[in-house]
Amino acid sequence: MTSTFPYIFYSNCATMLFEYDGGTPFHLYLKSCFKENKNWGSKDRKRYRSACYYFWRNAFGVSRQSPEIILHWLQMHFTTAVGNQNLNIPTSNNTASNQQSQNITPTATDNLNQTVNQESNTYNPYQSVAQYLSQNITTDILTPWFIKEPLVWLSNGNITLKGLQGQLIKAGITIEQTHGNALAVSAQVNLNPWVENGNAYIQDISSQTAMNWSNQPMAAFCHANSAVWDCCSGAGGKSISLLQQFPTTNLTCSDVRSNILDNLKDRFQLLGLKKPTVFTASLNGYLDNSNSKNPNQTYNVILADVPCTGSGTWRRNPENIHFFDSQTIETFAEKQLSIIQNVVPSLAIGGYLVYLTCSVFAAENEDNIKQILDTHPNLQLVSEEFCGGIDLQGDFIYRSVIQKVN
């Protein structure tokens, strides 16, 4: 097959991919590459970005190989994808410059064909971590989910959902999918105008599903006379979903990072939501901190969206799986247990602990819950499930609801 793009395009892609070491998010690394090559126009950058992310999603066995093999893989597979119109990008023979690469020489030998085909056929994205997967999560489930570029889900902020949808359509943006109070658009759409004015906020459909508490027992405590603590709030995405459903909730948010809590305050103000109580705390040492700024002794609901490997979101940053060290699973699992051990004393009798991860690994999910229940006889499992995932083409969000019975 004749290449859709000139050799220099594949050469530049292969060089960028080979030199990436996983130390920073790939989209930031890519920005630095673009900055170094100012002669690449906006269409060039779009093509490079599409090719690189196609590689991370599909090149399961060749990502750590030589630049030659990476280049040849792109020529074989990315060209086919563009030819089959699986990628919505413009094609041209004028990409980048006409200079020849100084790092890579063109080869398309039978040996390269054999290497690329063999590696591509013997790997799937989660094969190397299959032994760590949660119950009922298999590589057969994860593979088609991983290789498909995710949509971006958003909900209405300070306007109605109908109003938001109307604005997007008027701007020529196609609504790809709807579910409940959420809309999905292509990942290529620039949503900054709607996010920056508070008309919308971005949150994956699975996270929104995990925070849909209308039919959950903890909904009884989401009002002004009860106390809810989002103990690992980050920038407040889950809390925003909560207050959208229950606007009078007496909410407290904490995180170890004070700067991200400043972001949380700004988001709540922009969206016109009730201001939560906010404090900074390192939950690894929470119980030992006599100077804690925690304003309440007990809470009726504690939401623990704990730090994790993020393996249930890897298709958003597909490079992560190519550099993943399985030893970090245990590191995160131990940290998660430490956090839960330190917040359980602040849970009121009869109250609920909502444990969330965006991981597909058992050690971070059901194994941790078993340890929590084994060490706390006064806790009782109410439910556990994965929210969203393949059914909604969203992230894999694990949710466990636990009640403190005495």
Regions from the PLM with identified roles:
Residues 1-406:
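S-adenosylmethionine
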